Amino acid sequence: MIGITGKRTASAVCGLLFALGTPPAAQAAPEVPSGPYAFTAQHGPSQRAATWTFTPCGATCTAVDAERWLQNAEFHLNGGRWEYSGRGSMDCPVDHTPLPVSKTVSFDAVTLAGQWTTATLEPCGRGPAGGVVGQWDFQLTKAG
């Protein structure tokens, strides 16, 4: 005959086995950005604001139109961050000739806080290629 203590022990063991056998709750996939988002960035004393409009292109892909600096850019979800890497051009501040640049942009899939880095691909004036032209922290906020 099993006493009260035996029943409690058996109950505890069954509960433990059940808990161990239960798979962890799956985390929901981050929301794919869609529609307009407010973009704000602080770079030294200057602040920048714009609207980025996202169009999903898959479960881990979204394209953005964001003023002249970032058009038709595809972001891909990687390790909890939306990431984009591409090329563009800007005027060399020394002689005002077109200067090819690389752009690396990423933001956290949950907080929407991100970083943007632009670097030169060719020399500009006396500066070497590969110099960082700008690095900004930014925040996206879903509009509407």
Q: Residue locations for each model-derived region?
A:
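Secretory targeting and sorting signals
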Residues: 1-28
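Amphipathic hydrophobic-ligand
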Residues: 47, 93-102, 130-137
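Edge beta-strand at a domain terminus
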Residues: 118-144
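Tryptophan-anchored aromatic micro-motifs
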Residues: 30-50, 112-117, 136, 140-142
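Extracytoplasmic/secretory-pathway segments with low complexity and glycosylation-like composition
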Residues: 2-3, 30, 42-45, 89-95, ...
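N-terminal glycine/threonine-rich, aromatic-flanked beta-hairpin/loop signature
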Residues: 45-83, 118-119, 123
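Short, hydrophobic/aromatic-rich segments at coil-to-beta transitions
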Residues: 30-39, 58-64, 78-87, 110-113
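Contiguous, well-ordered beta-strand patches that form the walls/edges
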Residues: 67-111, 144
